[in-house]
């Protein structure tokens, strides 16, 4: 190795020297951050409780702290402001809990009352602040928070504080000066009466619970989760309710027990299926809509009418022994005699139902007009469809009332389209086809 290479070695270490000086300057700035509050003599040491008004609110109601097997953090969090330490000296901050009285507590009739002798005291557990040890300047530059301390009712170690449930405790802060085996000494021990609490496994006072939720940001997250859960339950309850409106009106199940034959007066106003065999379909009767939308397009304010035959039509289940339904001509009343307030502009009789053996088929009025007969098709379950309106208006018609008429038409009378408030076209109306008895085959009810 030449002398020239030996002369270059000191210059190679200059970057390291610059790095060390940079680190030392960072440490010095850290120490000087809280030096303005310092006192090398420690004679003016002051310790004040942070968030004292919040603690006072809890203390007025007798504060409660949850203890669990795995440990639960405190709220409010114990925070203190410290001043008067030696900025260049090293200190450790410790926390323990002492019994506030000599009896056990119980919650009776909305208040805490003494409930007997206390349990034997357990060995006092001490919590060491994770920043310990550190310079006095470090402890004085910002509030010292004990947010990570956990309270438990089981002696499991791990730096947790074990407490007896239903006993009242008071936190106690210790400041110890460190720096060598011979220099350790207790600087101060301080307590705050407003931080007393009763250890519980579940909150007893609802007002304490409300304060915890109001001021604890983590408890607010719990409250939001609970509200979402309640809302979901409410949606599930709504989803569990029968939803038949989207089926388009009539819903006839093709499985399950068959209902007995309905009353021969098929269209009586008060007719309903027998309760002894059709209880399982009671909700369908309550939720189904009218099978025939109204054919009129209203051009003036509606007139109130109390007559509605849609609610009186019974639900007709399929049956193997039914060959047809006898319907007389006087039962097929024109819809102009029974207007009701609706804004539907669909066709008159958008679909009709024919019952033959096990098939119930919807057929449009146009198909009936052209063929004069009912078709067969969809088995068991049916969805009502709509067809375009073949008529612009309904002419005035007069329906005679006879003694043999069905009870539903006992109050039938002549109704004029002008009187009812419905507009009519000046063009001649299209011919209408009325359903007569020859469109239906005789029915023989099965023997019971």
UniProtKB/Swiss-Prot annotation:
Keywords: Developmental protein, DNA-binding, Nucleus, Transcription, Transcription regulation. InterPro entries: p53-like_TF_DNA-bd_sf, T-box_DNA-bd, T-box_sf, TF_Brachyury, TF_T-box, TF_T-box_CS. The gene is TBXT. Residues 54-224 bind DNA. Involved in the transcriptional regulation of genes required for mesoderm formation and differentiation. Residues 290-312, 401-448 are annotated as: Disordered. Pfam families: T-box. The keyword NADP does not apply. Residues 417-442 have a biased composition (Polar residues). It comes from the Eukaryota. GO terms for molecular function: DNA-binding transcription factor activity, RNA polymerase II-specific; RNA polymerase II cis-regulatory region sequence-specific DNA binding. This is T-box transcription factor T homolog 1. One of its GO terms (cellular component) is nucleus. It is found in: Nucleus. SMART domains: TBOX.
